[in-house]
Amino acid sequence: IMGFLMLCMLSIMLPRAAVAADRVEEVLASRTVIHDPKEAKTFAGEKKGQLVFDHVSFKYPGADENVIEDITFTAKPGETTAIIGSTGSGKSTLVNLIPRFYDVSAGSITLDGVDIREVTQHELREKLGYVPQKGLLFSGDIKSNILFGNPDGSDAELEEAAQIAQATEFIEAKPEGYASHIAQGGTNVSGGQKQRLSIARAIAKHPEVFIFDDSFSALDFKTDVTLRKALKKRTKDSTVIIVAQRISTIMGAEQIIVLDDGKMAGI
């Protein structure tokens, strides 16, 4: 009987495995479209973080029309630049150009005077703390997730990042605290907890440029206000870019950019 049951299980698993194998093969066969320059430049040693968009336009590969059209602005250290607009206006696409998930179709983006296409992706991303809308967590524990971008970080840095991100309360409520297990993708924590841990990870990295892509959307109003107040003190010397839907999230921004159908409707 057991042999028959095993045979039935195999007959179910094999087709699923074949489909999964096709998907894995498709990923492995994909060509990288973003490349490092053959003779890469480097950033100056001084910590700055000034980000300049100069007449930036972008369209997805194979598309006929630009989704971002002629965007020009400067985000300065010590200031918060907020980007708002309706759904589909190009907010996330715009900030995804900064870590070079895509390259601009026209114009340029410079960081501290260097075109981001002229440095390696590793060096560029070392300067960035990026928090996507959907908090991304890895299998491991809370500590390893927060210190992912700063593996040599101290316990003091770990706890400070969690405190600023308003994650301390729910972490300390767990029996194992910072050693608590995190499932792949963070499926064993809530959406708000996932976002707070992702924010804590960016804080613990000590980047020059913070990018929050609607990263406060799953937080309640009180937590949102408290977190942003603590974050303002922590990022006083950094460049902060926030994509948001809620007006309350961007009230303290020094610069607000309004996008409409991929174009700047106001600043």
Language-model segment annotations:
Residues M2, S30-V33, E176:
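Flexible, glycine-biased helix-capping/connector loops in cytosolic signal-transduction modules
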Residues E26, V33, L147:
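Conserved E/DxxT/N motif and adjacent residues on the DHp alpha2 helix
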Residues R16-V19, V33, A202:
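Residue-level recognition of oxygen-bearing side chains
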Residues M2-V27:
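Cytosolic ends of transmembrane helices, especially the final helix of ABC transmembrane type-1 domains
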Residues M6-M9, A40, A161:
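Long alpha-helical scaffolds
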Residues A44-I267:
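ABC-type nucleotide-binding domain
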Residues V33-E46:
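Pre-NBD coupling/linker segments of ABC/ABC-like ATPases
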